[in-house]
Amino acid sequence: MNGAVTWTMTGSGYLNNSQLFDGNSKPTGTGLAFERDGYGVGLNDDEITTTPMRQEWIEVAFSSPVMVSAFYFLDLFQARTGGTLEIGQASIDGGAPVSLVAVDLAGTGAAGFVAAAFQPIYASVIRFTVLNSNDNLGYADGALAGIELAPVPVPAAGLMLLGGLGGLAMFRRRARA
């Protein structure tokens, strides 16, 4: 594999990202393209949905641990009447979940975009779901928009650089002599 990390995405049902982005404005500063409306579960649904009877999920597994530094969701909304809102969750390697709480009001044309950025942490498996809270329109749902990966530091690179500089210094001394 030459150091390449691969990933697989599975879900509690059919994975779907066929819905075009439908927000009235694209959030900036994330590096996301916002061409699609995120990943969801279901043949006719582009969202991860939770009902009183079931909780859908999406899981992303990496072939080797990667450093994750942010999660992005779309279609998480607050009820227009206040009080209730949708909450996306991401759990790294089965640990305590990171919660992404809706900030956009439902029915306003907003994208329902929520981001959670944090200090990079190693992850092999990330599970995404939505809590059974709601925006009072249908069921609690949201879509996985992205995972941000941080560069992985290479500890040996520093030693190689120092070794190379030391070799150059020694070569230079020999050339002067």
Q: Where are the language model's segments positioned?
A:
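Terminal, low-complexity interaction segments
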Residues: 95-151
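A short beta-strand element within beta-rich, extracytoplasmic domains
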Residues: 66-79
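C-terminal membrane-anchoring or membrane-association module
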Residues: 169-177
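An amphipathic, hydrophobic-aromatic interaction surface with interspersed Lys/Arg
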Residues: 51-61, 76-77
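Short, threonine-centered small-residue motifs that mark membrane-proximal processing/anchoring sites
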Residues: 141-169
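Extracellular and analogous surface-interaction loops
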Residues: 56-67, 117-121
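N-terminal targeting leaders for non-cytosolic proteins
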Residues: 1-54
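Short, surface-exposed beta-strand/strand-loop-strand elements in extracellular ectodomains
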Residues: 79-95
